[in-house]
């Protein structure tokens, strides 16, 4: 079945119109800026939309806005819209129908909206015709499947576009083919590809991506080769003789002692020429005589398929015997040479086609661009696209890269038509060549796999053309095919002072080291171990990245400049050597050194590398850009090493430097290996390198096993320190109590001496100061008592009445005990009298707060009478009063004592007899303890009250009251 010639032209024109309308319009607008879109044919189709703005938390957020624009634009041939903030909109009295409101954003200069839009003639992805190649774009987060109305889907190519991100294009053809080929319908979602296939986390790629697809709906009975369909479009072949000469030159340069085999191949080719002529006579007249010599040679290769399959079987059979017979190396060399020469022939055909295509494009554009530059751009782009032969991809690429629409003095429509026709014919031929190369390559690899263990010396893995055929620095970040067209990077190497400058560390980076001080020993050791692991791992990655940059730089020079087989290891060593020489000597000519090296390598080859001006400029850019990135990586290493050294010094201060023994030795060795460049076989940075220090935690486990007892001792020491501190505090408290008791005993034993000393003026001055302190302390105690009284409004009155009754009962009981004490210790009467006066002063102050003024005056008169007539009785009363006042002070200072007294008062109302008996026993116990001058009551009361501070204050008050009484006497 054949498609008529005029129908083919109509379909081609329709497809060309589709390509013209399938341009994508990329926009970056600010909030408030109006964006106006219009389609001359078809309707608007929003591919993606992302809002990047500052939110209320001062954070940059990324939000998809496809739905907002689609509501206004999809299905219309023109659209006007702008974005604004929600708060500003609420202040407007009338709403603008073209506005899109974003509620999460606040005003900022960083806010912007990124969109990509195209035009579609159809509103669905239903493909009506079979055997017609459709090209269209698919939006981000697509939910509409591609459907073949007649036939099954056959994906020719698929590209993932990210126009606002660092990597703008990614080839996803294989993934889409596996998913969609031979199906009636298929859903292609760019958002799903980014998240699930590529595991992308960057919001730029997730929100700002779309897919371009080339699809054909095929039936079970397919039409023949596409190259026959395109044979109707003629392109004059004026350089056919030159191509034949190039082919012969390439074949002769790669024979390598295989003349006999080549002669056989030539005989076979001559036989096949006859077959080709017979086959061509059976074709239609429309397909006769339209192709040049290049096309005829391609047809020869196509008709040689059966012969090649036969030879491949021979190779397989022979290699099976060769594996067991090592003496037949020459035969392997012949087979290898034969396959290599065939691949070189196809590569020569491909180069000739690119040269011819570049010449035609240069003529179409009135020689605005040199044909070599166009050819170089096409070859680089072809390799970047992984040798995809889809002509539509290169049509769009050339229209954009060469700015064809801006060229003057040309008929734009004719140029577009001719450009598309030339690309379609040439790329179809190149696709056929690529398939033949793939066949030869598979046979070559099969041969290599069968002899690589027995005869590995026959294949050079560093420079083999076939084994390294697919090696290309994809997404290298240093260079791209449109260099000097879409962007013009600097060709100058970075400043020497900046190059030798070390990376500096910031205070924030040192904060992790300074945060170790407040930790205890165990946590500090654990934290230092964790930080050491993190820093060493980060340094390992940085060293690998640095060495990989040298490798990427060498690979880019080979693929974009030299474009011939080249040993990357030797070039990488040379680049590293020149880098360190340049750091030592700023006048060192790095570019000349690389050019000389490539010329020396090229001296033994017949196919020379082309030292065109564009090639040399690309070489300079690669050297400058590569060294710049390497220097930045070195500064990162310097910063990490500074943090590592600071952590090591901190560990030394805590005697934990043993944790760094293994990592220190490793990093020293790593730095030496990373900077070595004398031996090409010792280039460091291979991805296959293994480092035991990171693969296991043996070092940390050993270090932890070396000091488990030390950690236990540290923990025990910490506990002992805490206990010793508490014991010291208790000792200090007991010593303070002992000193207070000693002062009391001395005052009791020597009252007369204290009285004599108090007659001096100095003592009077000191006593005046003590009086002031007593007054302030009494005021504080009164305020505390007032607060306690406020908290106990209902119970204090009853408590005071009971306390008064208890005081009277206690006085009667203490009088009897005091009489016996007078007989035993007559010397202590004076001290007791002093204590009595002190207690009376306190009683007066307290009675004034508790009783009315009349009761207080009566008690004072009774006290004076008792002091005049019964001196002995008053001394006994003072002792009891002291004990009672102590209990009262403690009860007033502590809520617990007051609560106990209140509970006692409440219980006394129920049973007065039991209360009085309990109080008598309590007073008697206190009297016995005071007579023996024992300090245990003070300690027990202190522990019961739970505070040593108030106990010390009460003792201090007693001493001060003694001094006041002495002064009064």
Curated annotation (Swiss-Prot):
Glycosylation: which residues?
A: 207, 268, 317, 360, 661, 697, 779, 876, 938, 941, 945
Q: What is this protein called?
A: Surface protein P113
Stretches of Low complexity bias are at: 312-325, 713-727, 897-907
The gene from which this protein is expressed is P113
**Signal sequence range:** 1-22
Tell me what organism the protein belongs to: Plasmodium falciparum (isolate 3D7)
Entry membrane topology: Lipid-anchor; GPI-anchor
Subunit structure comment from the entry = Forms a complex composed of RH5, P113 and human BSG/basigin; the complex bridges the merozoite and host erythrocyte membranes. Within the complex, interacts with RH5 (via N-terminus); the interaction tethers RH5 to the merozoite membrane.
Keywords, ordered alphabetically: Cell membrane, Glycoprotein, GPI-anchor, Lipoprotein, Membrane, Signal
* Start and end residues of each stretch annotated as Disordered: 223-328, 688-947
Keyword check for Membrane, yes or no.
Answer: yes
Q: Give an example GO cellular component term for this record.
A: symbiont-containing vacuole membrane
| UniProt function note | Membrane receptor which tethers secreted RH5 to the merozoite membrane during merozoite invasion of host erythocytes.
Query: Keyword Lipoprotein on this protein?
Result: yes
Location in the cell reads: Cell membrane
Residues with lipidation of kind GPI-anchor amidated asparagine: 945
In what ranges is there compositional bias, type Polar residues?
229-241, 688-705, 937-947
